[in-house]
Structures are given as structure tokens and as C-alpha cells.
Swiss-Prot record:
Pfam families to which the protein is assigned, alphabetical: LpxB
An annotated GO BP: lipid A biosynthetic process
GO cellular component, as recorded: membrane
Pathway(s) the chain acts in: Bacterial outer membrane biogenesis; LPS lipid A biosynthesis
Originating gene: lpxB
Keyword Magnesium: no
Classification of source organism: Bacteria, Pseudomonadati, Pseudomonadota, Gammaproteobacteria, Pasteurellales
Keywords assigned: Glycosyltransferase, Lipid A biosynthesis, Lipid biosynthesis, Lipid metabolism, Transferase
Family that this chain belongs to: Belongs to the LpxB family.
Record protein name field: Lipid-A-disaccharide synthase
Signal peptide: none
Coiled-coil features, chain-numbered ranges: none
Reactions the enzyme catalyzes: a lipid X + a UDP-2-N,3-O-bis[(3R)-3-hydroxyacyl]-alpha-D-glucosamine = a lipid A disaccharide + UDP + H(+)
Known role: Condensation of UDP-2,3-diacylglucosamine and 2,3-diacylglucosamine-1-phosphate to form lipid A disaccharide, a precursor of lipid A, a phosphorylated glycolipid that anchors the lipopolysaccharide to the outer membrane of the cell.
EC numbers, comma separated: 2.4.1.182
Length: 390
């Protein structure tokens, strides 16, 4: 490797990966001002000077049906990436998330003497744990957001570095509620529940009804309670409004385009689907209840495949049931309302418990707030310069 101008390959497959890639490139440029960046980039990575082989959107497909439909094109892109990398011989290849695409590329490149890093651990600790052997063969190192992920890799002696979570860096330890209310143009003197029905069509389909009925029950118990409903895009908004018109036509809601983070900061509590949103709610210091429903067959399979005691990231991080998880048959309006009312009550013990929970959230936030972009860049530098022991 040329010490001052390495060629660094990065491949991102969706918006979250583009954000991570751009942050990583920025930090690497500070160390290697003359480095060349190539791969598959989104607009943010392109703005940082990364050359792209194809538009990142080409990789952004979700769901089995969509993947099968686009499979010939995806395989062609993967073949093109492998051929290009074998010709260019970058000093390191960094696959950013997108494991179904990147791990096969990494496997081929590592076998041909190219250093590889996988940035963002697949949920191998939760299900399909045998993937760990492929990851070990494909990568020189995995960069993990969460400490329990590194602990899992350590059990299998697979090189992994915990770098902290970029979201924990982006959200302050003490979020500003007044500012969030101002951004949303809502009255800070009011009491609010944030309702996040998920970003996927299937999540909205399964969760909108129980979540809306929960809101009705809570409105009876707390007549002054108002509801903030951030929706990720126009498609999900139309889908949600259609369900609402049938289920709770007279319920007043503040529908918000995006801005989920501000809604959670402004709210007294949050009702949400599992996933990254639960981690974000924790970082926003919003007491939450996690609700999730899926097709019976999907649930039957998931119960047998998933190897963890909890499904939400706050509970996985704490290794205890910090926030209620109401899954499948437990995800009923009555049970959700019962759990949420504890957070919304003015009762002295409820207020005390709320403070204790928020302190737990703050402690967990501090554990994963490590300047992840910088840590990721340092891991790349250490691998390039032969100091990769962790």
C-alpha cells in the first residue's frame, strides 16, 4: 500500500449505508488526504468524492418478492463489482451493511488477497447464527454498533471492533423538548403520545388498527392527551389515513411528515413497532411500549429462528426487560393502553419510575456514544497499516 494515497473501496446499498459511508470517508480523508474512494455510492458519498460504478438505488430492493424480481440484475452488478475490484486491487474493501450482497463480494476478494471489512453487523446473534462462519471467511474485521454484538463475535474468535452507534452520536444526552415542540409547532404545555406504526407497508397494515384503538382507550383515560403520528413517506401516510378512516374516524391526531425523532423528544411516551425506532426512542429518552404483529406463519417461524430473549434494542442492550414488548397475541389495545398508562400517569410512583427509566436510557446512551465515524475510520487505518489487533 502507498502510505499516503490508498485506494479504498466502499459499497453501500441504501440511504442508511450512504450516511455511514459519507461519515467514514470524511474521517479517512482527514488521515489520507490523497486517498481514492471507489465503489457503489449514494448522493452523500458522491459529495465526499467517492466514484460509483452504478447508482446506489440499483441495490435498494426490499422483500423476497422484490429481490427475486431483480435477482438477475443484482447478480450482474455483483459480478461487475467483483471484476472491477480484482482489476483495481483496492487496499481495502468496506461492505457497508447489505450483507446479502456484500458478504459474497468480500468472500471472493479476501480469497484473492484483498483486505475486507464489513461495516454494520448482520443480526447474526439473533437468528441464522451459522452465518458467522461465512462472515469469518469473508472479512478481516466486522465493525459493530453494539457491545453485545462484539461479545457474540468474540465467542467465535471472529475479529470484531465495537465502534459505538452513529445515532448515539447524533442525539444529545439531554434532548431539548422545547425545541422539538417548536419544530413541530405544538404546545409544550400539552401531554403527548407519539405513535410510530413502522416504515414498511406490512407493519402499517398489522399495527395501525391496534395502535389507533389503543389511542382511543387512552383518550378516555386521559382526556387532555394528544397524539403525534410521524409517517415516513406519502405512501405510508395514505395507507395509514385509509385505515384510520375505517377504525377511528373521529379521533384527532397530529399527522407529521417524517420528524419521528422530534415527535419522540416532544412526547411523554411512545408506542412503536420494534426495530431501529426503539433504539432511537431510547436515545430520545422517551418511555416506550413496543408492539408488534405479523402473519401467523411468519411469527411461527420467527419464534423458532430467533435466539434472543428480547426483540427490542433497549432490552437487548440492558439485558433485561426495561421496556414492555407486546408481541402478536399480546399486542392488543387493552394491554398496550395498560402499559402506556403507567408512563402517562401523574401518580407519584409512576413519575419516579419514569425518572428511573430515563436514567437507564441515559446510561445506555453513554455506553454506545463513542464517535462511531472516527472509530470506524481508525479501524480501517489500523487494518491498512497492520495494527488491526483488537
Amino acid at each position: 500500500m502507498n502510505k499516503t494515497n490508498p485506494t479504498i473501496a466502499l459499497v453501500a446499498g441504501e440511504v442508511s449505508g450512504d450516511i455511514l459511508g459519507a461519515g467514514l470517508i470524511r474521517q479517512l480523508k482527514a488521515h489520507y488526504p490523497n486517498a481514492r474512494f471507489i465503489g457503489i455510492a449514494g448522493p452523500r458519498m458522491l459529495a465526499e468524492g467517492c466514484e460509483t460504478l452504478v447508482d446506489m438505488e440499483e441495490l435498494s430492493v426490499m422483500g423476497l418478492a422484490e429481490i427475486l424480481k431483480h435477482l438477475p440484475r443484482l447478480l450482474k452488478i455483483r459480478k461487475n463489482v467483483i471484476q472491477t475490484m480484482l482489476q483495481e486491487k483496492p487496499d481495502v474493501y468496506i461492505g457497508i451493511d447489505a450483507p446479502d450482497f456484500n458478504l459474497d463480494v468480500e468472500l471472493k476478494l479476501k480469497a484473492n488477497g484483498i483486505k475486507t471489512i464489513h461495516y454494520v453487523s448482520p443480526s447474526v446473534w439473533a437468528w441464522r447464527q451459522n452465518r458467522i462462519h461465512k462472515i469469518a471467511k469473508a472479512t478481516h474485521q466486522v465493525l459493530a454498533f453494539l457491545p453485545f454484538e462484539k461479545a457474540f463475535y468474540d465467542k467465535f474468535n471472529v475479529p470484531c471492533r465495537f465502534i459505538g452507534h452513529t445515532m448515539a452520536d447524533a442525539i444529545p444526552l439531554k434532548p431539548n423538548r422545547a425545541e422539538a415542540c417548536q419544530t413541530l409547532q405544538i404546545d409544550p404545555a400539552q401531554r403527548y403520545l407519539a405513535i410510530l406504526v413502522g416504515s414498511r407497508g406490512s407493519e402499517v397494515e398489522f399495527l395501525a388498527e391496534p395502535f389507533l384503538k389503543t389511542a382511543l382507550l387512552l383518550k378516555e383515560q386521559f382526556p387532555d392527551l394528544q397524539f403525534l403520528v410521524p409517517l415516513v413517506n406519502e405512501k405510508r401516510r395514505i395507507q395509514f389515513e385509509t385505515i384510520k378512516a375505517k377504525i377511528t374516524p373521529n379521533l384527532d391526531l397530529h399527522l407529521i411528515d417524517g420528524n419521528a425523532r422530534q415527535a419522540m423528544i416532544a412526547a411523554d411516551a411512545t408506542l412503536l413497532a420494534s426495530g431501529t425506532a426503539a433504539l432511537e426512542a431510547m436515545l430520545c429518552k422517551s418511555p416506550m411500549v413496543v408492539g408488534y404483529r405479523m402473519k401467523p406463519l411468519t411469527y411461527f417461524l420467527a419464534k423458532r429462528l430467533v435466539k434472543t430473549d428480547y426483540i427490542s434494542l433497549p432490552n437487548l442492550l440492558a439485558n433485561e426487560m426495561l421496556v414492555p414488548e407486546m408481541i402478536q397475541e399480546e399486542c392488543t389495545p387493552e394491554l398496550l393502553a395498560e402499559k402506556l398508562s403507567v408512563y402517562l400517569s401523574d401518580d407519584e410512583s409512576a413519575v419516579k419510575n419514569r425518572h428511573v427509566l430515563i436514567q437507564h436510557f441515559t446510561d445506555l446512551h453513554q455506553k454506545i456514544q463513542c464517535n462511531a465515524d472516527k472509530q470506524a475510520a481508525q479501524a480501517v487505518i489500523d487494518l491498512l497499516e497492520g495494527k488491526e489487533n483488537v
